């Protein structure tokens, strides 16, 4: 490493001195000249795989477009060196396992670096001079000979690809290769090319001199855009006829180091756990280079670390693999609590570290390891806990842990060192990391008044290094509270007969108070007595019966009756205890056997015996065997007997019975001779054999057919009545109109188009006012006696137009008070105004000129408002 740095420093220093010496001698650049190597790649072939020191491989040509002699070269492989004239020599013994490639670089007069690629190939049939001749002499490609006739055609010639360096400096167009045909010895031949870079995109990159066959490149090539061009060359005669088969030409673009590497990410992030051993891989960085990394070193990258921040505890904690970019730990002392993060400045350089470079950033997070133990703070606690409380929070214990919060290395795990009886439990609060101490069982003040607990704490993750365990002491004092009394035993069972008399003692309950140091009085109560059969003495707990016990009650299940008992003390906070009293009710023969069913039907002809099932609410021995007999004279017409099993009875008539209902008195007795009289109702029907259903008697004693005939007759009469009513409703009634229309005899209206002659509001005819008062229609009534009243006095029309207002007011008042004026609902006659008038619809009201007879009796149905009108038009009919 030191020798390489020293060599690079000496190269740079020598280059600087040379530049200072040659700057005064720099002449003007030759027109079109650009500094650089004559070729982007040199291939030196050797005839052996082992090269001795001092062996000459070839020569490179470099021109910086000045008159000075160039003599400083930088060789990318330390096994070779370059003389000032460009001769490449073997610096030390070299053994070739495969083709060796390296780069030779130099600087022009302006300080710009130029590079060329060198390839050393082991080929016995080629010499270094032959390989070098490719760069100094342009090749000539000749069309292969064509064969005619029936001879089998040999395989086509394989034309070696033409190599052209990218970014060449010209001048352009620049000759690449000459295409020749052997036919040009006899005839004039013209050449052309087709394909990619010629007539296909990218067009115009290559062209050919159509007479000489020189193939030219017109501009610099870019390998990153197109790394290969495939073209076809053509040869034709003067008349355009092909003289050769098309020949394929491949042009490979040789890469130059013209692209800087690029990191695949702006910032690389990784992590490593504190306390890990050296050699642990942390992360990897990666970069890309668009240059060739297969046939040259231009795209071969080398990685390095330029800077570490912070440089603690040592400057070089990390290293990077030059080829893969994997960053590993090489030092010790990672401590997240001191330095939780490291930032590395990394560099990627092509040409295996001798070319273009780019810098990037890698951030390494130091993850937590459990290298810090949790510590109680404080380490002693006291707590007061009421007795009998389950799940009561006794105390919260706090710890401090320097590890990263939220990680298993920080999460605390608490344990109770001695937990006799399992009275306590401790859990961890996930948010605060506190230990929550609770009661798992109820504490009893009378048994133990204080507990001293030792609690330890660790982490969910084991310690990465040996660490001491922290311990806390919790002193728990039990607080005495009023506890509820309890029954002894909690469940009492007693056998009691169902005929228990009222006030008879059943049991004396016993309860105890756990508060021994408190003298308290106990009281007894009944909590739940569904049937209200029991009574308890409040002071001594003696339970007595009310005389109502019944084993056959719905409250008794499986001969047991359950009662909830309560006991209380007289403390400040009353405590209540609960007990259970279970009574096993003993049976008493208080129920006689009864038959079922109690209603049945039977035929009067050859009846089958009726089977009646016998049941008894009591239990053996107060049930079967049963005895059956008939009483109250039922044995005269009926017979009863038990079946073979003795659980049912057969009831049958002793003689033929008439239709009707019969009451049978059945007397049943159980094994203890407890009798039970039951009345069974039998209905005898007119049938034979087994009676399934008798026809019920109808009301009034009629048979069913008679009732059906009566109902049919009533229904027929009802239908006939409805049809008659419908016929009357559908009878057509011709209604006459109230008034017939008369012929249109109204006067026509004329329109006058007068112009001038004064204002229109003063052009009126006063005679029309007088005419309107005198032309009232005469209305004659013959239905009432007329009342003679003086006629009103109307003022005549004044001659002076100025008095027309008084004339109107006075005559209007006289008309309002005229007793002879017709009512508002009187028939009015309107003047004829000609056909088409809007008032034509009122013409039907004028019926005075009609001689037709009309029936106006329906006016009487219109109410009191039309009564007078009905009297006027209906009076003639009454007189007739």
Curated annotation (Swiss-Prot):
Any keyword Cell membrane? yes
The positions flagged as glycosylation sites are: 61, 343, 382, 400, 425, 428, 469, 471, 473, 475, 558, 562, 576, 578, 580, 681
Membrane-spanning ranges: 704-728
The segments annotated as topological domain Cytoplasmic are 729-880
- Record's SUPFAM superfamilies? Cadherin-like
Annotated disulfide bonds:
603-687, 685-694
Q: Which PROSITE patterns match?
A: CADHERIN_1, CADHERIN_2
One family name in Pfam for this protein:
Cadherin_pro
Where is it localised?
Cell membrane
Which stretches of sequence are listed as region Disordered? Answer: 790-826
Prosegment location in residue numbers: 29-155
The record, for CDD domains, names: Cadherin_repeat (cd11304)
Q: Which residues lie on this side of the membrane: Extracellular?
A: 156-703
Keywords carried by this UniProt record: Calcium, Cell adhesion, Cell membrane, Cleavage on pair of basic residues, Disulfide bond, Glycoprotein, Membrane, Metal-binding, Repeat, Signal, Transmembrane, Transmembrane helix
Q: What is its main location?
A: membrane
Gene Ontology BP, a term: calcium-dependent cell-cell adhesion via plasma membrane cell adhesion molecules
Please give the InterPro entries that the UniProt record associates with this protein.
Answer: Cadherin (IPR039808), Cadherin-like_dom (IPR002126), Cadherin-like_sf (IPR015919), Cadherin_CS (IPR020894), Cadherin_pro_dom (IPR014868), Cadherin_Y-type_LIR (IPR000233), Catenin-bd_sf (IPR027397)
Q: Which PANTHER family match?
A: BLASTOMERE CADHERIN, CADHERIN-23
Q: Domain text from the record?
A: Three calcium ions are usually bound at the interface of each cadherin domain.
* Quaternary structure note: Interacts with CTNNB1.
- The molecule here is called EP-cadherin
Which species is this record about?
A: Xenopus laevis (African clawed frog)
């Amino acid at each position: 490493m030191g020798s390489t740095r020293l060599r690079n420093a000496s190269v740079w220093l020598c280059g600087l001195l040379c530049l200072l010496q040659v700057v005064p001698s720099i002449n003007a650049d030759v027109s079109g000249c650009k500094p650089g190597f004559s070729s982007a790649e040199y291939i030196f072939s050797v005839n052996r795989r082992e090269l001795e020191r001092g062996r000459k491989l070839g020569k490179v040509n470099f021109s910086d477009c000045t008159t000075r002699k160039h003599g400083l070269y930088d060789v990318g492989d330390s096994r070779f060196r370059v003389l000032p004239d460009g001769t490449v020599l073997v610096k030390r013994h070299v053994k070739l396992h495969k083709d060796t490639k390296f780069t030779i670089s130099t600087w022009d007069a302006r300080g710009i670096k130029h590079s060329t690629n060198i390839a050393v190939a082991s080929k016995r049939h080629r010499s270094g001079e032959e390989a070098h001749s490719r760069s100094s002499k342009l090749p000539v490609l000749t069309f292969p000979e064509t064969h005619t006739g029936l001879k089998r055609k040999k395989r086509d010639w394989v034309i070696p690809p033409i190599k052209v360096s990218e970014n060449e400096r010209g001048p352009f167009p620049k000759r690449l290769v000459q295409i020749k045909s052997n036919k040009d010895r006899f005839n004039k031949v013209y050449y052309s090319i087709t394909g990619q870079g010629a007539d296909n995109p990218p067009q115009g990159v290559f062209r050919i001199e159509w007479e000489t066959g020189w193939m030219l490149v017109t501009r610099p090539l870019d390998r990153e855009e197109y790394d290969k061009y495939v073209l076809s060359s053509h040869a034709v005669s003067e008349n355009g006829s092909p003289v050769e088969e098309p020949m394929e030409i491949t042009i490979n673009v040789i890469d130059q180091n013209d692209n800087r590497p690029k990191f695949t990410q702006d910032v690389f992030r990784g992590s490593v756990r504190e306390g890990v051993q050296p050699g642990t891989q942390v992360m990897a960085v990666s970069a890309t280079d668009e240059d060739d990394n297969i046939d040259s070193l231009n795209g071969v990258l080398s990685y390095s670390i330029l800077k570490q921040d912070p440089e603690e505890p040592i400057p070089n904690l990390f290293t990077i693999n030059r080829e893969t970019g994997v960053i590993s730990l090489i030092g010790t002392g990672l401590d997240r609590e001191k330095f939780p993060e490291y930032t590395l400045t990394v560099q990627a350089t092509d040409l295996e570290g001798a070319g273009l470079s780019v810098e990037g950033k890698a951030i390494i997070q130091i993850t937590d390891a459990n290298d810090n133990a949790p510590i109680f703070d404080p380490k002693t606690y006291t707590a007061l806990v009421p007795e009998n409380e389950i799940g009561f929070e006794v105390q919260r214990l706090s710890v401090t842990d320097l590890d990263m919060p939220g990680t298993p290395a920080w999460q605390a795990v608490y344990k109770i060192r001695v937990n006799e009886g399992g009275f306590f439990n401790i859990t961890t609060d996930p948010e605060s990391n506190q230990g929550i101490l609770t009661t798992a069982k109820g504490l009893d003040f009378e048994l133990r008044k204080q507990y001293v607990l030792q609690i330890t704490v660790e982490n969910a993750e084991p310690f990465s290094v040996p660490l001491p365990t922290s311990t806390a002491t919790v002193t728990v004092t039990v607080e005495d509270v009023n506890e509820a009394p309890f029954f002894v035993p909690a469940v009492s069972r007693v056998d009691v007969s169902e005929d228990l008399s009222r006030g008879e003692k059943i049991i004396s309950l016993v309860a105890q108070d756990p508060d021994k140091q408190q003298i308290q009085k106990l009281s007894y109560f009944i909590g739940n007595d569904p049937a209200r059969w029991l009574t308890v003495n409040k002071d001594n707990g003696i339970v007595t019966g009310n005389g109502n016990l019944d084993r056959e009650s719905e409250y008794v299940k499986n001969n047991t009756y359950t009662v909830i008992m309560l006991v209380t003390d007289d403390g400040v906070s009353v405590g209540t205890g609960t007990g259970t009293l279970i009574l096993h009710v003993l049976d008493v023969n208080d129920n006689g056997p009864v038959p079922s069913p109690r209603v049945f039907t039977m035929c009067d002809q050859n009846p089958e015996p009726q089977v009646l099932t016998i049941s008894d609410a009591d239990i053996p021995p107060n049930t079967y065997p049963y005895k059956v007999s008939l009483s109250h004279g039922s044995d005269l017409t009926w017979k009863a007997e038990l079946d073979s099993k003795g659980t049912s009875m057969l009831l049958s008539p002793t003689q033929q019975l008439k239709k009707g209902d019969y009451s049978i008195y059945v007397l049943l007795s159980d094994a203890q001779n407890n009798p039970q009289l039951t009345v069974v109702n039998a209905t005898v029907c007119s049938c034979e054999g087994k009676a399934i259903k008798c026809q019920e008697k109808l009301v009034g004693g009629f048979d069913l057919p008679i009732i059906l005939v009566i109902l049919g007759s009533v229904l027929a009469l009802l239908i006939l009545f409805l049809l008659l009513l419908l016929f009357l409703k559908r009878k057509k009634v011709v209604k006459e109109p109230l008034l017939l229309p008369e012929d249109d005899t109204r006067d026509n209206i004329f329109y006058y188009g007068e112009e001038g002659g004064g204002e229109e509001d003063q052009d009126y005819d006063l005679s029309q006012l007088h005419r309107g008062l005198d032309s009232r229609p005469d209305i004659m009534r013959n239905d009432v006696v007329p009342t003679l009243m003086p006629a009103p006095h109307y003022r005549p029309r004044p001659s002076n137009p100025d008095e027309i207002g008084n004339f109107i007011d006075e005559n209007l008042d006289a008309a309002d008070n005229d007793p002879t004026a017709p009512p508002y609902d009187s028939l009015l006659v309107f003047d004829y105004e000609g056909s088409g008038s809007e008032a034509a619809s009122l013409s039907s009201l004028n019926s005075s000129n009609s001689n037709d007879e009309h029936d106006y009796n329906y006016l009487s149905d219109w109410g009191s408002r039309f009564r007078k009108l009905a009297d006027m038009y209906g009076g003639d009919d009454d007189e007739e």
